[in-house]
């Protein structure tokens, strides 16, 4: 009898792809705190998962019923939609019932990936997110903040930065509650901020001088290349700053409110908490 119960519980396992990333880590922590079994889908996971090696996919789907689906490095890169399609087909053939996709606002390729889920026959939920607040503290922008000068090709366009904790809360709700099936949530924060204003709020929270310098996309791409960053990363960042940040996403949405029944976390609250945790200390 115990074996039957254990097997039933194993079949409720949720696969968290990108489980060591900004949102995946938080999703995994929340599911674990609820006593729900998870499997981390990453190159260091057991079994390992690698988007570039389809042979690793099937073992991670064994005895899984739901998947939190993130694509690395981004759904905008060439080949992402084909990979998502192949994975979703395998997931459905493996008996997966629920798929929750992390997507991006204003990205045509991401919307094509969303359509794959919508056509899959699974209980799907799509989280179409604005820029993460945590990009300033858990990404390559942390070092510029610590150095006191943030250089980016972003002008006077407002962005409704969303907190990764809000994204994780919505993702967990979608993975564990039936009412989110078939929902597309656009997730934003409660305010529009330019990147210069966001850096200013971080400066205020830390009590330090942190300057913001705007450069051209060409200058920025050249600087990234000189820093020996991968060409794919340079292309992606330039794409996001020149295409996604062209004003198309400079508006607020009510996705967090609809999904969770509460307001999203403000960028200033994120900045204060992150500063207090010492993340930006030199």
Please give the residue ranges for each predicted region.
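Short arginine-rich
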Residues: 281
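Mobile cap/lid helix-loop segments that border enzyme active or cofactor-binding sites
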Residues: 211-277
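Oxidoreductase cofactor-interface core, primarily capturing Rossmann-like NAD(P)-dependent enzymes
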Residues: 2-39, 43, 49-55, 62-65, ...
